[in-house]
Regions:
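Bacterial N-terminal signal peptides that target proteins for export
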Residues: 2-11
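Hydrophobic core
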Residues: 15-19
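C-terminal motif of bacterial Sec signal peptides marking the signal peptidase cleavage site
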Residues: 21-24
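Alpha-helix boundary/N-cap detector
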Residues: 31-46, 88-99
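Short, non-transmembrane amphipathic alpha-helical segments
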Residues: 52, 86-115
Length: 152
């Protein structure tokens, strides 16, 4: 009778320990999305001002105005000093799109390498003078799973 009681107590203690361990493990390992956001936040804090300064006048008529994290990408925002439509944007920048992507791909690659998550990248966000979105261009790393879709 005493052995059964000790076995029951031991089993109960083990179940409690297992539950505590399982709960503790759940809290110790952040999700892939949390890891990515942490890497992106850190990258933005350390490099945001440099990116804004470097690309301040990269696009004719648009200033690099912000660098921030949104979803699973680093957003580099450009604001035009005029009202511009999507067709006007396409006419001005579509012929140079390969060079634009090549210019920003190293940033996407650096982020993907640091976080070891391939579906991340950079999104170039273009706003007109009134703050309305004109175009967004997602750029993934070289081996990225990030979907690049220029149709909007």
């Amino acid at each position: 009778m005493m052995k059964k009681r000790l076995l029951c107590i031991a089993a109960a203690v083990l179940m409690v320990l297992a539950a505590v361990f399982a709960f503790g493990c759940e809290k110790q390992f952040p999700s892939e999305q949390e890891v990515l956001k942490s890497h992106l936040d850190k990258y933005c804090r350390e490099n945001g001002e440099k990116i804004i300064e470097k690309y301040k006048n990269y696009f004719s008529g648009a200033q690099c105005s912000a660098c921030y994290v949104d979803n699973s990408a680093l957003v580099i925002e450009f604001r035009f000093d005029e009202k511009i439509s999507d067709p006007e944007f396409q006419q001005r920048f579509a012929p140079d799109m390969e060079n634009i992507i090549a210019e920003f791909r190293p940033i996407a690659q650096e982020i993907a390498d640091a976080s070891e998550i391939t579906y991340t990248g950079v999104v170039l966000m273009f706003l007109d003078s009134e703050g309305q979105q004109v175009q967004s261009i997602p750029i993934g790393a070289n081996n990225s799973n990030m979907i690049v879709d220029f149709s909007d």
